């Protein structure tokens, strides 16, 4: 780590952390060591920013469990939201014409895909092992995008 002008290490002010394979283990849970490290950093005044490909409500659930109150970067960076009130601080939408084209490709190719409209994330999947009743809040299974 670099040092400042006075030779001291600069104080860490922000840690951005991914969920899958970083904060969450293979079982999609947070280890005790990771939870303690995040809580210690929050207690020391460090801003913890979750940055993930996942949708907001899943990232928020993790933030809430750890006491993280900094904005959440989610949806592969296309959305930044406040975990406190859900306010959208940044939202990058795919233009309608391109979204329709992408949906048609996913439907025709029978690809698994997700699309978020408002606060609902739609999961296009044909996998028989997906139980719609067990999907996280804010996610619905669909047969077409």
Where are these regions (language model features)?
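Extreme N-terminus of proteins, especially the signal/transit-peptide cleavage junction
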Residues: 1-13
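Residues at structural and domain junctions
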Residues: 7, 24-27, 45, 88
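Asp-based phosphoryl-transfer active-site loop
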Residues: 11-28, 102
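Active-site phosphate-binding/coordination module
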Residues: 32-136
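Anionic-ligand binding region
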Residues: 137-145
């Amino acid at each position: 780590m670099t040092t400042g002008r006075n030779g001291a290490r600069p104080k860490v002010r922000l840690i951005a952390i991914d969920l899958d394979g970083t904060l969450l283990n293979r079982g999609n849970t947070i280890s005790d060591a990771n939870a303690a490290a995040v809580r210690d950093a929050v207690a020391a005044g460090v801003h913890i920013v979750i940055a993930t490909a996942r949708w907001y409500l899943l990232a928020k659930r993790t933030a809430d469990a750890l006491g993280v109150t900094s904005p959440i970067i989610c949806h592969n960076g296309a959305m930044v939201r406040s975990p406190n009130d859900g306010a959208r601080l940044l939202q990058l939408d795919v233009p309608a014409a391109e979204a329709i084209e992408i949906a048609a490709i996913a439907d025709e190719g029978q690809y698994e895909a997700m699309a978020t409209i408002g606060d609902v994330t739609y999961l296009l999947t044909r996998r028989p092992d997906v139980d719609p009743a067990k999907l996280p809040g804010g996610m619905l299974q669909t047969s077409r995008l």
